[in-house]
């Protein structure tokens, strides 16, 4: 049987913590920032954690992570 392939787009977007949770960088912080409040920009700057149901799906996309 051939090796499982890593989904390259998922590899760029997600990272695993030491506890096995999946973290990601939030979107909407690249441009058109003037209309976004400073509170919103500050919250977007922090990384987010993926829910447990989505974590299972991401682990199938990243078999060797």
Swiss-Prot record:
Question: Which positions are tagged coiled coil?
Answer: none
Region called Disordered, residue ranges: 34-53
Keyword Ribonucleoprotein (UniProt): yes
Q: Sorted alphabetically, which keywords does the UniProt record give?
A: Ribonucleoprotein, Ribosomal protein
Q: Which GO terms describe its cellular component?
A: cytosolic large ribosomal subunit
Q: Where is the composition biased (Basic residues)?
A: 34-45
Record's PROSITE patterns? RIBOSOMAL_L35
Q: Which GO MF terms does the UniProt record name? A: structural constituent of ribosome
What's a single GO BP term from this record?
translation
Q: Which HAMAP family match?
A: Ribosomal_bL35 (MF_00514)
Q: Which family does it belong to?
A: Belongs to the bacterial ribosomal protein bL35 family.
Quote the protein name from its UniProt record.
Large ribosomal subunit protein bL35
Organism the protein comes from: Borrelia hermsii (strain HS1 / DAH)
């Amino acid at each position: 049987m051939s090796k499982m392939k890593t989904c390259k787009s998922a590899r760029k977007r997600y990272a695993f913590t030491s506890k096995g949770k999946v973290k990601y960088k939030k979107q909407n912080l690249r441009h058109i920032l003037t209309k976004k409040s400073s509170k919103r920009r500050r919250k977007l700057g922090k990384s987010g954690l993926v829910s447990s149901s989505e974590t299972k799906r991401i682990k199938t996309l990243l078999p060797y992570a």
